[in-house]
Amino acid sequence: MNMTKRDFIDTNTYTKEEIQYMIDLGIKIKESIKNGYYPPLLKNKTLGMIFEQSSTRTRTSAEAAMTELGGHAQYLAPGQIQLGGHETIEDTSQVLGRILDIIGARVERHHTVAEVGKFAKVPVVNFMSDYNHPTQELGDIITMTEHLPKGKKLSDCKIVFVGDATQVCVSTMFMATKMGMDFVQFGPKGFQIKPETLKIGQQNAKVSGGSVTITEDADEAFKDADFIYTDVWYGLYEAELSEEDRMKIFYPKYQVNAELVAKASDHVKFMHCLPATRGEEVTDEVIDSDYSIVWDEAENRKTAMRAIFVYLLNPELRKAQASQAVADKYDAEFSLMLRNAVDDQRNAD
């Protein structure tokens, strides 16, 4: 394992144990901050953020995560830097890797972020591509961990993704199957996960004990579901059909409404990556309900960013994956550091 450079471009390059470690790390840092202590785990570190597409949650959560933990973020807007234009992606990545400590990129094509990761000598985080959305994945699995049904583990749970096979749908399948969950896409033919991508989820499930199902049958999809997830019906990168044509395909069968939710378990939770088009893929009644966890989900984008940045920029955390003794030692030292710092801050107050 390369202890000096690790990217977060595709969660399929991580083990279940590594993902679980990041889940626990994110929750631990979140609890520390709620107790009033901001551990300076990213002190003097600088994140460069490349955005080829607009962003609300990703940009703000990344900037806030860096600031809260003692670091700094720079926004690199389209047109303000060379990236595959006058200067090659390779050259730009080499330069940024010499100046920055970590790079985040939201790109139109997955190839771009993969190339940045290949040539930059610092960690690179995929802030979303036309293929996947791994930071959303981690935030979502943290949210599900915080809202597990009583007596259940992640590996006992079933999640249903409703609608189009967007990059968020694909990412949900990747993460769910990695963690041993049962994943279902409830969507129309022509908008289901592509076979070559589906194979990755099936392989994950084979290893973890989870499952993957693609169906157009609502009763089959929602039976015993613990989580329901949806996304917009027209993705950032798809222009084959007009919004009107897509509405004809998806509405009303694939709208998450009270009637559809009633088919799931009585403890089901609703999720949406946002922004939501209310009245289309989800009704106001559902998104504003007491079983909706979309706002916790949005907040946990920052929880995920903290965990990812700290994990990538602290090699000792990656070493902990190779040795349970090192992991236990680091966990003990980290917990002690947080307790002492909180006590010191309270005494100062």
From Swiss-Prot:
Enzyme Commission code: 2.1.3.6
Signal peptide (from-to): none
Enzyme class: transferase
Any one cellular-component term (Gene Ontology): cytoplasm
Domain of life the protein comes from: Bacteria
Residues the entry annotates as binding putrescine: 272-275
Catalytic activities: carbamoyl phosphate + putrescine = N-carbamoylputrescine + phosphate + H(+)
Molecular functions (GO terms): amino acid binding; ornithine carbamoyltransferase activity; putrescine carbamoyltransferase activity
Marked site: Important for structural integrity: 30, 146
Cell compartments where the protein resides: Cytoplasm
Assembly: Homotrimer.
Family that this chain belongs to: Belongs to the aspartate/ornithine carbamoyltransferase superfamily. PTCase family.
Protein function: Catalyzes the phosphorolysis of N-carbamoylputrescine to form carbamoyl phosphate and putrescine. Is involved in the degradation pathway of the polyamine agmatine.
HAMAP family: PTCase (MF_02102)
Name of this protein: Putrescine carbamoyltransferase
Organism, as annotated: Levilactobacillus brevis
